[in-house]
Amino acid sequence: NKKYYDFILNISEDGWFGKSIGPKQHLAHSIFRSIEEGKNVIRSTNNGISAFVNPKGQIIKQISEKGYFDVNKIKRVDKTYFAEHGNKIFFYFVLIYTTFIVILKIRENK
């Protein structure tokens, strides 16, 4: 009995990045997770970029200074293929590719 949550909460301490591109990369990772899982992401940081990202990867609200924002409604979204099956799709691609290569090698040796 797995529970399905409507959002991902990402809490991060980005202070050690300094003035580098690190906080932007962390935000980008959150965007990818929202698309991958088909969930809203609420990202809270102390020295980085806090944001609310919808399941399509669009940044709805964002702040990079001290402050806060309210998230009023989080809509439930259906699971994506990746959320349902995980990395199985990559296994299938490798299996198909390997089978294809083996068939080519067998034909080449005839």
Name these PLM-found stretches.
Residues 66-90:
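Short, aromatic-rich amphipathic segments at membrane interfaces
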Residues 22-24, 56-57, 82-86, 96-98:
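Surface-exposed beta-strand edges and their flanking turn/coil or helix-capping segments
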Residues 36, 77-78, 108-110:
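Short, charged/polar low-complexity linear motifs in solvent-exposed/disordered segments
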Residues 1-69:
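CN hydrolase (nitrilase-like) catalytic-core segments centered on the catalytic cysteine
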Residues 39-44, 71-78, 96:
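Short, surface-exposed, charge-dense and proline/glycine-enriched linear segments
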Residues 84-109:
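Selective detector of the "anchor" transmembrane alpha-helix that sits immediately C-terminal
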